[in-house]
Amino acid sequence: MADLKVGSTTGGSVIWHQGNFPLNPAGDDVLYKSFKIYSEYNKPQAADNDLVSKANGGTYLNRVIFNRGIQVPGAGNGLTGMFVGPGDGATYDNVNLDIISWYGIGFKSSQGTGPRTIVFNVRDGEISARGNINSQRQVRAEAAAPIAANDLTRKDYVDGAINTVTANANSRVLRSGDTMTGNLTAPNFFSQNPASQPSHVPRFDQIVIKDSVQDFGYY
């Protein structure tokens, strides 16, 4: 039987033994010195390597970059999540980030169990809000005319309506009295009171028709 000593070799390589390769069992684990050896049976856990667990979750303490996007499951069909846009811009054709939903996107406060306060219908672009919408600049509408009673109205539509009202007002005579800037023509004018001032238009019973014969009776 060979006499193994410190530094014994075989084929030029040092022979491993408990002295130079200390493996110690510890329950279901095997330790090299004081370090755990991972195996197919004893796989490393997320916490052992500062990883976020797929099953148990975790917290990233610094910025995380996703080159493609983030997809989350949601009700309905189709893709839901945040994804890189086609380019640098702020138009319908070109944006930096796309937030995609099958139908709607909602916003709600984490305080209590209150309802959603803002809802985006991403199918037709409708936005619903429970509170006021305050803007430091203009709110513009592309629709030429309002449809519903509570629709916002464009300035050009209001200006056109005002001009129509003004035109109608300027072309009409007020029942309460008015002053004409031009001629007033009508088939007949009826006066309930006889003329009493030089500027009044006399009634028929106050005038003598030219070339007519008047019977003033007997005196």
From Swiss-Prot:
Signal peptide: none annotated. It is found in: Virion. It comes from the Viruses. Transmembrane segments: none annotated. Keywords: Host-virus interaction, Viral attachment to host cell, Viral tail fiber protein, Viral tail protein, Virion, Virus entry into host cell. Coiled coil: none annotated. GO terms for biological process: symbiont entry into host cell; virion attachment to host cell. Structural component of the distal-half tail fiber. The distal half-fiber contains two molecules each of Gp36 and Gp37 and one molecule of Gp35. This is Tail fiber protein p36. The lineage of its organism: Viruses, Duplodnaviria, Heunggongvirae, Uroviricota, Caudoviricetes.
